[in-house]
Every structure is written in structure tokens, then in C-alpha cells.
A protein has these predicted regions:
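Transmembrane helix-loop-helix hairpins at the membrane interface
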Residues: 3, 11-166
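Long, low-complexity, intrinsically disordered cytosolic termini of multi-pass membrane proteins
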Residues: 163-180
Length: 180
């Protein structure tokens, strides 16, 4: 329960520290996504180093986790800079709540799936969690797809349009007599 609360607040630490220097929410998203990628890298290396599973299986299963961390932290970076620059505090609160919900759901589903391989003699909690195990992998797949789609949508939304024209004010253009 505490893991999503702490991780989603701390992962974008570079955005927290540099929010005053970041000039746009798009830059906050990019920096946040990089923070999430770095976090996922270290978390996945730690998972692979614990042993007990084939390395390729660990990497394959952790791809979704990496996407979740990158997307959540990118969204948090976007919301943090939006709160700092544009005073959009409600957006920050909603994105933080969303990130905690996704992360908490992810952890629950992973736990349910993991419990399915344990013997039923471990008690009622293991049995109750293992009941949801058949739904855990499809639900994790759905969460991965949603988070990957959010990365694509935010990338398209925050990318400058190629049709935007850059208008540069020149001394000649600013004089009334220079217009044709």
C-alpha cells in the first residue's frame, strides 16, 4: 500500500528539484519519463539479480513494469511543471492519484499472480488472492497497453506541431512603414 504512495512522489525527484528551471510541461514530461526509465532500470536489475528465475523470463515480465514506471513518472513530471508554471494544482493531484491507482493495481495483480503458484496450505489470504490469478495476467497486459497508449498520446499532444510557424520580430517588421 505504501509503495505506490512513496514511489510516485519520489521517482520524479529531478523534476521536483528543477521545476523552476524547466520551461514547459512537455519538458517536465520528458524529464519525468527519463526518471521513470532510470528507476525501472535499477528495479529490473535488482529483480534479475535475485535469481530463482530465468533471466529472459524476468526481463520479459518486467517490460510492462518499465512501461508503467516511465508513463507514470512522465505524467507526474508533466503535472509537476504544470503546477509550478501554470498553477494547475488539481491536475497534479489527479495525476498523482492516477499514478498511485495504477501502481497499486499493478502490485496487487502481480501479488495475486505470484500467490497462484504457492500451496493452498499457506492460509486463507493466499487462497483468496490465488482466486484472482487467472485474471491477473490479462489485467496486467491491459494496464501495460493503457500506459503505453498514454505515452503515445502524451508524446503527440506535447510535441510541437510541424505546422506552427515561428514568428521572429525583426526591427524592419516592427516599423509601420515597412509593411507592404
Amino acid at each position: 500500500v505504501l509503495t505506490p504512495i512513496v514511489e510516485e512522489a519520489v521517482k520524479p525527484i529531478a523534476v521536483w528539484l528543477g521545476a523552476g528551471m524547466i520551461t514547459s510541461p512537455a519538458q517536465g514530461f520528458a524529464l519525468g519519463a527519463l526518471c521513470g526509465a532510470g528507476f525501472a532500470l535499477f528495479e529490473n536489475l535488482a529483480a534479475a539479480a535475485t535469481g530463482g528465475m530465468d533471466w529472459t523470463l524476468v526481463v520479459t515480465l518486467r517490460i510492462g513494469t518499465a512501461i508503467m514506471h516511465i508513463a507514470n513518472t512522465g505524467l507526474m513530471g508533466w503535472a509537476l511543471v504544470g503546477a509550478w508554471r501554470e498553477r494547475r494544482f488539481l491536475r497534479l493531484a489527479l495525476v498523482y492519484a492516477w499514478a498511485m491507482l495504477v501502481h497499486g493495481s499493478w502490485n496487487f495483480l502481480a501479488l495475486a499472480y505470484g500467490m497462484s503458484s504457492l500451496p493452498p496450505a499457506l492460509g486463507m489470504a493466499a487462497e483468496e488472492l490465488s482466486f484472482s490469478a487467472p485474471y491477473a495476467l490479462p489485467a496486467i497486459g491491459l494496464l501495460t497497453a493503457i500506459m503505453f497508449a498514454s505515452l503515445i498520446v502524451m508524446n503527440r499532444r506535447l510535441r510541437p506541431s510541424p505546422y506552427m510557424q515561428l514568428v521572429v520580430e525583426t526591427p524592419e517588421a516592427s516599423r509601420p512603414d515597412s509593411r507592404v
